């Protein structure tokens, strides 16, 4: 007599997709990508500030302190603009991603991938030999 349930090693349709190890891997990957992006943004901002200070230190120092003519310093204005710009960028990408997700009517990343493959043409894969650097860089 056959059983209707899944055997060992098989998954039923009612179970949550993916094992806990897969979910943990995705969470770790998301944390890694988020921290790498944050580190890149911070490095870019610090590099830009140090370059501005190196280029003209007297103007940089004038911009760090508020005066009677300027009630807000230039650096605090720049930080506020960076914060609002980052917020708008994150929210904008999230809204666009959510709108595309809902417009396509997909429920998982596998559905999204198959939908994208059906919409866009396939990318041809050439197995030709790679060009040699001597050939590419050779003068006429």
Curated annotation (Swiss-Prot):
The modification N-acetylmethionine is found at residue 1. GO terms for cellular component: mitochondrial inner membrane. Residues 1-28, 102-140 are mitochondrial matrix. Residues 50-80 are mitochondrial intermembrane. Scaffold protein that participates in the c-ring assembly of mitochondrial ATP synthase (F(1)F(0) ATP synthase or complex V) by facilitating the membrane insertion and oligomer formation of the subunit c/ATP5MC3. Participates in the incorporation of the c-ring into vestigial complexes. Additionally influences the incorporation of subunits MT-ATP6, MT-ATP8, ATP5MJ, and ATP5MK in the ATP synthase. PANTHER family: TRANSMEMBRANE PROTEIN 242. Belongs to the TMEM242 family. This is Transmembrane protein 242. It comes from Mus musculus (Mouse).
